[in-house]
């Protein structure tokens, strides 16, 4: 094994400390939970839930924000094509976000991701939020950079949401959703000002509300 491969393996193993603690408490199916898309002005919020097999190394798994699109896509493909990896996704619409607020919508997306897992976890590691759930759970601040299963969930959610935003770009090409994925960049704000909001904008978010 070369030095780079060893470093990648060690980095991954350093992110399994929380999982190992929970394994030693007697749990066996530990799901990492993360969301993508709380901050954007447009598009849904998406959550991922991922159960990684104990003892198997997935080199390169890291906080999705620290990976290039190419790296994320490669790791996503590895995860979804591994029969020992179990994952679920939850999507909450713009309409629902505007109805109940982004925090509650995020919790709904996380609950949906857990429900969509093909097997039932017995413990949850959740990035940054206390998630009311019948399954025991632990909140980990900045969990996507500390927990392998949360990082894997963040990658799966990010890739799925980015694909959705590219689809929305085909329907609403004036806004550049394929580039900024709905976040409030200068180009996005300029397009909002020029064209007004479309159906996939979050009307409850101040920068969108201000252009009505």
From Swiss-Prot:
Q: Name one GO cellular component term.
A: ribonuclease H2 complex
Binding, a divalent metal cation? 34-35, 127
> What's one GO MF term for it?
RNA binding
Task: Tell me where in or outside the cell this protein is found.
Answer: Cytoplasm
Spell out the InterPro entries in the cross-references: RNase_HII, RNase_HII/HIII, RNase_HII/HIII_dom, RNaseH-like_sf, RNaseH_sf
Kindly list the biological process annotations in GO that this record carries. DNA replication, removal of RNA primer; mismatch repair
Task: Print the keywords alphabetically.
Answer: Cytoplasm, Endonuclease, Hydrolase, Manganese, Metal-binding, Nuclease
Reactions catalysed: Endonucleolytic cleavage to 5'-phosphomonoester
Q: What is its EC number?
A: 3.1.26.4
State the Pfam families in the record.
Answer: RNase_HII
Predominant location: cytoplasm
Q: How is the cofactor bound?
A: Manganese or magnesium. Binds 1 divalent metal ion per monomer in the absence of substrate. May bind a second metal ion after substrate binding.
| Cofactor(s) of this protein | Mn(2+); Mg(2+)
Q: Where is the RNase H type-2 domain?
A: 28-212
Instruction: Tell me which PANTHER family the record gives.
Output: RIBONUCLEASE H2 SUBUNIT A (PTHR10954), RIBONUCLEASE HII (PTHR10954:SF18)
Q: Which family does it belong to?
A: Belongs to the RNase HII family.
Q: Which HAMAP family match?
A: RNase_HII_B (MF_00052_B)
What is the role of this chain? Answer: Endonuclease that specifically degrades the RNA of RNA-DNA hybrids.
Q: What is this protein called?
A: Ribonuclease HII
Gene designation: rnhB
